[in-house]
């Protein structure tokens, strides 16, 4: 075996070396030609009397009876069926709620101006949440950067002190210096003092520094860039995943293929010093003076310190490339300004934090946003990424036109399907997981209506993780951006113990108008509008008892598993992110290099 060595210095602590070629040993990709797993819903339910946490996280209960076994003291919370310190409980429960996060702007190309970057923070605990922000190990003053909002309004009020239980705030983390003027630049709202005025994200491929946000109790965190992005035309949002759920094995997922306005991107983040990251690239990594390049299918090694991120932005996608680290890391996939499709008339920044490989699933439900012009068959792109050779896919109710039925390790497949034409896709077993994303096309189509229809300029390219059914949870809190004309949430619920459980949305009560998905009767979906053309969304109930959904903080819960994805769009602008997710380990067999 030939050994190649490439070294480079990244700042003072970041280096890379290309090491020996991949082995032909594919042990981790053993084929399994057995039939697909039998549907669990066809088997009789067995009593499950394990201990678990109550929905409010305040008690340990019996799963089969709901009987309270232990009520947690006020200063503790339930996690992994044990009363413990709140942050430890959140880490044990492995969800998107947590106490330690890293994130950075998805401004991967400096051709686009440094606009306002904001974070939506929701206190999901029963105690006040204290928030701290740092970068490069230095604390950042946020005393003038935290604001409250009113449901359905863009008005902001300064917030001081801790976030109350169940409360939410917007933290304005970054903006350009005062006086900046540029086309499509969106500054932070008047009266806001952003926490920072500099950008520590590299221009295209390079090394940058991420923000670190920590709290004393669990919160839900979303990064929005730019805030008020409906006027920037390039907005994106991502649910930020806590450090406690990071992993040491990943597969790179870019947001979309390259075009003349934008290139596929990945940001790999370290939370500890002396983190060693090895990438097995599916295509050549084009290096520069800051980052060592590497030929396709030959591993390249990088060293990172806490809070650093390695950013790779290039025309050739690296989707399907394996990333392995000696300490927990995470990755954000995206595109510096994607056109979907590549002939679309406008582009948009894409960014999603990608779950580590061990959290990928073998079953997903595909269903999209409320159609932009009323056509439930509006073609919406889906993308699949496979992790194992010999991955076989089955669908219900039918195979969508163009959808793959077999995939190999590192392979990417895309197809379009009606936004309301819901389907279930599953592989032969849990050890053949896939990643699935949903996308929105440009609001003006391709400008001519030849390959992509126009939607009157509404919406723009977007990219969002679809949550695996094995990662559904039973409560979420999230924030709908009031600066967008349209905000809608898509909810999918799974049958639990032979029955569908009510799903409660704070502005609506128990949701109705569920539609079946597939043929086995295991899933249903519904949608709720939170705004329409800047006006309030759906109304529930009659007379004095009627309630109206609006933008701002949203809370949902159920006694059964479900998922919720928020979509927002405006003229040539869009954003989307999951309202939350469990982050359970679903896979036992490690990744192996893709040859």
Outline where the language-model segments fall:
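Short, solvent-exposed coil/turn linker segments
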Residues: 5, 71-73, 506, 510
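A generic signature of intrinsically disordered, low-complexity regions enriched in glycine/proline
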Residues: 28-30, 36-43, 66, 104, ...
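Cysteine-rich, disulfide-bonded extracellular modules and peptides in secreted proteins
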Residues: 33-94
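Beta-propeller blade repeat segments, especially FG-GAP/WD-type strand-to-loop junctions
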Residues: 7-10, 119
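Ser/Thr-rich, Pro/Gly/Ala-heavy low-complexity intrinsically disordered linkers and tails
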Residues: 2-5, 15-50
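Conserved functional hotspot residues at active sites or interaction interfaces
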Residues: 51, 84-320, 324-422, 426-595
């Amino acid at each position: 075996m030939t050994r190649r060595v490439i070294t480079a210095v990244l700042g003072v602590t970041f280096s890379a070396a290309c090491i020996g070629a991949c082995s032909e040993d594919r042990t981790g990709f053993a084929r399994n030609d057995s039939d697909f797993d039998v549907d669990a819903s066809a088997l009789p339910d067995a009593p499950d009397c394990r201990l678990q946490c109550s929905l409010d996280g305040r008690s340990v209960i019996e799963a089969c009876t709901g009987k309270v076994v232990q009520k947690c003291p006020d200063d503790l919370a339930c996690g992994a069926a044990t009363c413990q310190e709140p942050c430890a409980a959140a880490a044990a429960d492995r969800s998107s709620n947590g106490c330690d996060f890293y994130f950075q702007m998805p401004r991967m190309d400096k051709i686009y101006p440094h606009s306002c970057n904001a974070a939506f923070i929701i206190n999901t605990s029963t105690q006040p949440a204290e928030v701290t922000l740092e970068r490069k190990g230095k604390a950042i003053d946020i005393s003038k950067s935290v604001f409250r909002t009113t449901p359905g309004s863009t008005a902001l009020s300064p917030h001081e002190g801790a976030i109350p239980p169940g409360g939410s705030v917007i933290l304005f983390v970054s903006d350009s210096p005062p006086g900046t003027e540029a086309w499509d630049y969106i500054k932070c709202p008047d009266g806001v003092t952003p926490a920072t005025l500099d950008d520590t994200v590299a221009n295209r491929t390079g090394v940058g520094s991420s923000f670190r946000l920590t709290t004393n109790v669990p919160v839900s965190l979303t990064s929005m860039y730019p805030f008020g992005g409906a006027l920037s035309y390039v907005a994106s949002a991502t649910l930020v995943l806590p450090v406690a759920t990071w992993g040491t094995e990943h597969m790179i997922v870019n947001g979309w293929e390259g075009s003349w306005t934008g290139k596929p991107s990945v940001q790999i983040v370290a939370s500890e010093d002396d983190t060693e990251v090895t990438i097995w690239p599916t295509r050549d990594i084009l290096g520069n003076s800051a980052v060592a390049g590497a030929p396709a299918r030959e591993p390249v090694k990088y060293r990172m310190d806490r809070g650093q991120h390695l950013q790779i932005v290039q025309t050739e996608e690296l989707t399907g490339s394996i990333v392995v680290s000696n300490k927990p890391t995470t990755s954000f996939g995206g595109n510096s300004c994607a056109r979907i499709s590549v002939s679309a008339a406008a582009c948009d920044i894409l960014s999603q934090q990608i779950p580590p490989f061990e959290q990928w699933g073998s079953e997903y439900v595909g269903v999209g946003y409320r159609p932009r012009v009323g056509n439930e068959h509006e073609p919406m792109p889906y993308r699949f990424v496979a992790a194992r050779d010999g991955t076989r896919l089955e669908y219900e109710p039918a195979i969508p036109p163009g959808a793959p039925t077999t995939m190999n390790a590192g392979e990417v497949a895309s197809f379009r399907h009606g936004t309301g034409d819901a389907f279930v896709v599953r592989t032969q077993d849990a050890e053949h997981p896939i990643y699935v994303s949903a996308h929105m096309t440009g609001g003006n189509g391709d400008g001519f209506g030849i390959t992509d229809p126009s939607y009157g300029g509404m919406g723009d390219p977007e990219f969002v993780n679809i949550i695996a059914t094995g990662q559904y949870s039973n409560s979420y809190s999230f924030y709908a951006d009031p600066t967008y004309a349209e905000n809608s949430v898509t909810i999918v619920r799974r049958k639990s113990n032979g029955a569908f459980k009510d799903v409660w949305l704070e502005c609506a009560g128990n949701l109705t108008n569920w539609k079946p998905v597939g043929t086995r009767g295991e899933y249903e979906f519904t949608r709720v509008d939170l705004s329409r053309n800047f006006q309030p969304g759906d109304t529930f109930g009659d007379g004095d008892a009627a309630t109206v959904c609006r933008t701002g903080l949203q809370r949902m819960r159920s006694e059964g598993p479900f998922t919720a994805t928020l979509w927002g769009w405006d003229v040539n602008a869009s954003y989307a992110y999951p309202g939350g997710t469990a982050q359970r380990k679903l896979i036992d067999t490690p990744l192996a290099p893709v040859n």
